[in-house]
Amino acid sequence: MNYEFDLHTHTIASGHAYSTIKEMANSAKEKGLKLLGITEHAPTMPGTCHEFYFSNLKIVPRVINGQKMLLGTELNILDRDGHVDLSESIIRDMDVCIASIHPPCFQQDRSKEEVTRAYLNACENPYITIIGHPDDGRFPVDYE
């Protein structure tokens, strides 16, 4: 299979990855990716970036060593209403916003109904472009 892009990646800034943005760009270029998205975890995830990090993304080049880049975040869906952990004033300037449910950040009932409601409500946010790993078995989803 030939992949042309990867939009769900993390650097050392997220606290659990090992490469810098520049190293990720170089690796993506070596692999022949046409587009690389860097989407660090938003602040509710323990050990990750402060909101100032995301405000500063606007100064990072969108082409690094010839590799086209999108810079954004992996937001944490916090509740059944689909609220996320960065403000609209920050996420509206990002190239890509993934919204995901993670165990340390979603402290709501994890029933299929509540998780599905959380994802559907998050989809109403005009700045969210991708739903991250909805197949996580810890958070059952009604696909019907």
Located regions from the model:
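Single, functionally critical "micro-switch" positions that shape active/binding sites
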Residues: 7, 39, 132
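Alpha-helical scaffold segments that flank or form the walls of functional sites
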Residues: 22-36, 56-60
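Short acidic/polar active-site loop segments enriched in Thr and Asp
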Residues: 34-35, 39, 129
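Extended substrate/RNA-proximal surfaces in nucleic-acid metabolism proteins
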Residues: 2, 42, 47-144
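Glycine-rich anion/phosphate-binding loops
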Residues: 16-20, 112
